[in-house]
Every structure is written in C-alpha cells, then in structure tokens.
C-alpha cells in the first residue's frame, strides 16, 4: 500500500499543478467568473492538494500492520486513495452544476476523514503489543 499512496500522492500533486494552470490559461485565472463558480473551482483545487498530500504522508510513513490491523488499515487506505480522484472529478464537474452541490468533493472529504480515523484506530498506543504482533507477522518483503 505504501507505494500506491506515494504514487497517488505524486500524481495528485502534479494534477494540482495542472488544474492551477487550467484555471489560469483556460479561465483567465477565474476573472469575471461569478463568485459561486469561482469558489467551487478554488475549493476543489485545494481539496485535490489536500488529498494528495495526505497520500504522500501515508506513503512516506506507513508501516506494516499485523493482527486485526492488517484488515482495518487497507479499508482506511482505500478511502484515502479515492480522495484525489473524487476531488479531481469535483474540480471538473461541480463548478458547472446549479447551486452549491458537492456530489464529489463532499464524499472525498468525508472519505478521507473516515480513512484517517481507521488509520488512527490501527495506531496502537501499547508498544509491547505492537512489537509482539509485528514479530509474529510473516515477513512482507522488506516493506517497512
């Protein structure tokens, strides 16, 4: 999962830079656009950066899990991995919807929150239990 988080994070940061250029070149840096549409463009742009940076952080610091954590952590990772993709969809779709509906950005933000809460639950405060579980876990190919 670690490399997947890193890859999604890097691609997401590149996507963030590309969407910034898109707003600048295609929409004249959002000049003359109504306030609601400009708000939707900019917030989705920042959600893309947010989701990408969370994935980068997980990719850099995620450690192997053992025991029940081996099953809970991937669920959290899937939710976090979906965040940049949903934010990117929100960037291109939501500004053109009527009103301030957020059918992509809202699930992206809540999914990232839920995923990180699952990662938090997996982070044991009892170090001895964690060490015992990791020693009992089979070698996972050097992923640390």
Predicted stretch roles:
Residues 1-45, 49-144:
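Polytopic transmembrane helical bundles with strong interfacial aromatic enrichment
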